[in-house]
Regions:
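Active-site- and interface-proximal helix/loop "cap" or "latch" segments in soluble metabolic
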Residues: 23-158
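C-terminal motif of bacterial Sec signal peptides marking the signal peptidase cleavage site
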Residues: 16-19
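Positively charged n-region of N-terminal signal peptides that target proteins for export
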Residues: 1-4
């Protein structure tokens, strides 16, 4: 009887401590936030958008980055094009990513890094123009507009 009582007390104590687990608190307000940047490149007009979802604990739970462009009066997004965007061979030729990676695959690396780090403090540029990321492997795309769009979304989340 004594062993059963001690086991019960230990079990209640364990559940009590588990319920007191500290909840990670982020620095952002709960909600979905949007940022965008417009620019022109190679004769096409682009709008880069970033959507950032922050949960009730203030933590970044998801990031979605895409780039819409209009060329020859046709609008589409880079994520919609998937492999048809045709960046894999270019990134392979740069030599940083074995076998290369499409645009959407590279931007997913950036999205995941933002969720992991919960901020953009990790961003380091490898060029004076601040277009090439030096702080994340698997990315050869010019990333300045993507980071700027996320910055705008996170600014709204503060």
């Amino acid at each position: 009887m004594k062993k059963i009582l001690l086991s019960f007390v230990a079990l209640v104590g364990l559940f009590t401590l588990a319920g007191c687990e500290k909840v990670n608190k982020g620095k952002y307000k709960e909600g979905t936030y949007f940022g965008s940047v417009e620019y022109e490149s190679y004769g096409a007009k682009y709008v880069t958008t970033a959507t950032v979802y922050v949960d009730e604990n203030g933590l970044i739970k998801s990031v979605f980055i895409d780039s819409t462009y209009n060329k020859d009066n046709v609008s589409t997004t880079k994520k919609t094009l998937k492999d048809a965007y045709g960046m894999k061979e270019t990134s392979k030729n740069i030599g940083v990513i074995p076998n290369g990676a499409e645009w959407y695959e590279q931007v997913e690396v950036i999205e995941k890094k933002i969720v992991e780090e919960q901020n953009l403090d990790w961003v380091k540029w490898s060029d004076a123009e601040k277009t090439k990321l030096d702080s994340v492997s698997g990315v050869t795309i010019t990333a300045d507009t993507y980071i700027k769009a996320v910055e705008k979304a996170l600014e709204l989340a503060k």
